[in-house]
């Protein structure tokens, strides 16, 4: 509900009792929620001081972003989890995801002012998150992109009964990519590249 109203960070203050295996379950739950809602997800469980004769609380804290656990404290250690969440990334992911549609209808928003605090970032943010650092994975990713584009163009050329593909060449990288895709599409259709 909060994510559909536009929240990019959701805090879950929980009183989840501790049992054997519960920490692993909690990690999976928090990771899945953050992925499903395309958000930063803060999970803070009741701590040791809340334990009773019937229930034991471990104070397990977790922070996840879009399916990845970024930070957590160990259950029973009394510490805190802290990190940064890339809210702009979450907004971009939502804009790209066609099955995620914002709807704030019936949602009550409480306005407040908050002065930004001076802080030092502790998390490395990849400046090129969609370009794998590993050369083999990068080559595989590029090949997949070319295949996807060529397949889409081939389908369009077939559907339009086009005899040729016309490309405006400026000498830039975009027109170079367009030419590579067009050649692959023609090859896929069993037609000469000159078409």
Region roles according to the model:
Residues 10-13, 126-131, 161-162, 195:
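Short acidic (Asp/Glu) and glycine-rich catalytic loops that position anionic groups and cofactors
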Residues 21, 93, 177:
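Short acidic, gly/pro-rich beta-turn/loop elements at beta-sheet edges
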Residues 114, 137-195:
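ATP-dependent adenylation/nucleotidyltransferase module used to activate substrates
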Residues 34-38, 66-69, 87-89, 95-97, ...:
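Glycine-rich loops and low-complexity Gly/Arg-rich segments
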Residues 2-4, 121-126, 187:
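Short hydrophobic/aromatic-rich motifs at helix boundaries and adjacent loops
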Residues 80-157:
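Flexible inter-domain linker/hinge segments
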Residues 1-81:
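CN hydrolase (nitrilase-like) catalytic-core segments centered on the catalytic cysteine
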């Amino acid at each position: 509900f909060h994510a559909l109203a536009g929240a990019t960070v959701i805090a879950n203050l929980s009183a989840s009792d501790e049992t054997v295996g519960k920490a692993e379950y909690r990690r999976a739950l928090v990771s899945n929620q953050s992925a499903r809602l395309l958000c930063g997800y803060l999970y803070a469980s009741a701590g040791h001081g809340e334990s009773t004769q019937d229930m034991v609380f471990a104070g397990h804290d977790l922070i996840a972003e879009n399916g990845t656990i970024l930070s957590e404290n160990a259950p029973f250690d009394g510490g805190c989890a802290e990190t940064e969440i890339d809210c702009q990334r979450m907004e971009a992911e939502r804009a790209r995801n066609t099955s995620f549609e914002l709807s704030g209808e019936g949602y009550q928003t409480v306005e407040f002012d908050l002065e930004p605090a001076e802080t030092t970032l502790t998390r490395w943010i990849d400046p090129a998150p969609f370009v794998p650092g590993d050369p083999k994975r990068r080559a595989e990713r590029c090949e997949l992109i070319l295949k996807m584009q060529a397949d889409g163009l081939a389908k369009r050329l077939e559907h339009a009964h086009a005899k040729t593909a016309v490309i405006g060449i400026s000498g830039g990288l975009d027109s170079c990519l367009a030419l590579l895709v067009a050649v692959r599409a023609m090859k896929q259709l069993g037609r000469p590249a000159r078409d």
